[in-house]
Amino acid sequence: MMAVHGIKHLVLLGLGRAHIQVLRGLADIRPADLHLTVIAPRPQALMSPMVPGFVAGHYTLAQCQMPLDGLLERSGAHFVAGSVAAIDAHAQRVTLASGDTVAWDWLGFAARWLHVVT
């Protein structure tokens, strides 16, 4: 989905700290001219301060993960469970490992995705 009648499509790849902040901000304002899609393996985030405790055996991996279903709903995001296989910057399209594609007007992604940009 690209811009239709003034509506822009923002696609966020992953649920890291920066994207969680974006979702929090959008949950407060819910712009009518924005369609939001989040692509990540699961609707949860790893709480990085707990990783040392996980490595030391004090926490399970499940205890280190924060569910984000509520935040996704409040922000109006459409959640897509998947991983990215390619980002075509020229065509403004993300291809998922499943073969599905998602078009975007604006794209948010972490540096770890640079290896799939064409």
Cite the ranges covered by each PLM segment.
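FAD-binding core/adjacent interface of flavoenzyme oxidoreductases
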Residues: M1-I7, G76-T118
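Beta1-alpha1 glycine-rich phosphate/pyrophosphate-binding loop at the start
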Residues: M2-H78
